[in-house]
Amino acid sequence: MKKILILFAAVLTMTLAGCTLDASNNGDMDGNWQLMRVDTIGGGSTDTKNWQIFYAVQFRLLEINAYSYPVGNGGFMFHFDQTRDSLKLSTAAADGSEMYDLKNVAPFGLTSLDEHFKIQLLNSDNMVLESKKLRLTFRKF
């Protein structure tokens, strides 16, 4: 019986030691964010709340979907790198190729397929991202 317990403990230890878990370091960024407003740096503003545009953030993936947008429903996937004050999106294609046409992603707050945002505000309820041309305001949903 003692040998069986030792064998079981050894197998369990080896099994658990072989597992690596990648944990998300995104902090408040993780979750579903509803795009509430898109402001141009020049002063224009568009209320996007009724279009139900959502950015879903998990681990290193960002998915953009729209549920009431009049032209298209999104379904765009991007990888992202986040630092304390910036967010850089890049295509989710394994080979790094462009998966989408810029004209299709532009209505969802992107001006480039490799977009770089400055994080103006990020907490558990609100997020404000600013690119060279746009300011995106989100609420956590």
Question: Which role fits each region the language model picked out?
Answer:
Residues 2-9:
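Sec-dependent signal peptide recognition
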Residues 20-27:
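Bacterial lipoprotein signal-peptidase II cleavage site
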Residues 15-18:
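C-terminal motif of bacterial Sec signal peptides marking the signal peptidase cleavage site
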Residues 39-46, 60-122:
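Contiguous, well-ordered beta-strand patches that form the walls/edges
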Residues 30-32, 49, 56-57:
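Exposed, flexible binding/inhibitory loops of compact, secreted disulfide-stabilized domains
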Residues 79-86, 122-141:
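Edge beta-strand at a domain terminus
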Residues 27-44:
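Tryptophan-anchored aromatic micro-motifs
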Residues 36, 65, 90-91, 129-130, ...:
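Beta-strand residues in well-ordered beta-sheet regions across diverse protein folds
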